[in-house]
C-alpha cells in the first residue's frame, strides 16, 4: 500500500465500541449528559484508547453517542498495525481493565465494572476475536463516514484546561493511569521535582515561561518534530524518571518500530506523563531538549517561533 502523508500506510477502517456499566446505579449515558463528568469521561476514554491502540494519529475517536444505558464510541483506525494492537488489547482484556480504572477515577467511584462490545458494520466482532485477520478485514471494510465531531474538539480543549489548572482536576489525561513496568535492575532513588505551583515560571533564552504539566498537544508537537533524537531526549528524562530507565527505551523502540518515529516519540512522552503525573512538566521537557541541542523544537513547543524561524 502507498504511504500516507504521515508515513502511515493507507489502511483505514472504522468500528464501534459499546461501553456499558455492569452496575445498575451507574448509567454511563446519563453521566455523560453532565458537562463536568463528560469532560472527565472523555479523558478516561482517550487515555484507555491511547494505551491500547496508540496516538490519536492512528486511533481516533470520531464521535461519542449516548444510547441509554450505553456509550457508543465511533473509532477510526489509520494503519493495520495500530488496529491489530487494539484488537489484541481488547481480546486480552487490557482495554477493559484500563478503561474500568480510568472511568472509576473520572466518576469518583471505587470501581466501574464494564461490559464491552465491538462491532464493524453488521459484524459483532467479539465472537471473531480469535480470528484476528477476519476482524481486521471487517474493520477495514467499514470506512469512516464522518469527520471528527466538533464536540470532541471542545472536550479536548476543556480537558487541556483542566490539565493546566492549578488543581489536578478529574479526567486529566495525565493522572491516575497505571505506570508501565519498571526495570528490575536496582537503581538509585531519583529526586522527584515537585508539581508546578500556579504562576511558577522558568527561564528560556532569558524569557520567563509559565511552567505547567504537559498535555496532549505538547506530546503531538514533540512527536512530529523530534525525529531520531527521541531516544536522546528519553535518556535525559530518564535521569529523574525511573519508568524511563533501561530497558524502557529499547522496549519502546522495538514495540513501535513498525509504526515509525512519530509513534515511538509519542509513546515516550506518554509513558513519561503516565509515570510522573503533574510532575511531567514543560520545564523538564524543555531542559531535555536544550541539553540535546533541540532549541528550535523547544521554541516551537513554547510558541516562540515565527513562521520564518525567528523568535516571536
Swiss-Prot record:
Adapter molecule for TNFRSF1A/TNFR1 that specifically associates with the cytoplasmic domain of activated TNFRSF1A/TNFR1 mediating its interaction with FADD. Overexpression of TRADD leads to two major TNF-induced responses, apoptosis and activation of NF-kappa-B. The nuclear form acts as a tumor suppressor by preventing ubiquitination and degradation of isoform p19ARF/ARF of CDKN2A by TRIP12: acts by interacting with TRIP12, leading to disrupt interaction between TRIP12 and isoform p19ARF/ARF of CDKN2A. A motif (Nuclear export signal) lies at residues 147-163. It comes from Bos taurus. A motif (Nuclear localization signal) lies at residues 231-244. The lineage of its organism: Eukaryota, Metazoa, Chordata, Craniata, Vertebrata. GO terms for cellular component: cytoplasm; cytoskeleton; nucleus; plasma membrane; tumor necrosis factor receptor superfamily complex. InterPro entries: DEATH-like_dom_sf, Death_dom, TRADD, TRADD_N, TRADD_N_sf. The gene is TRADD. Residues 166-200 are annotated as: Disordered. Keywords: Apoptosis, Cytoplasm, Cytoskeleton, Nucleus. This is Tumor necrosis factor receptor type 1-associated DEATH domain protein. The keyword Nucleus applies.
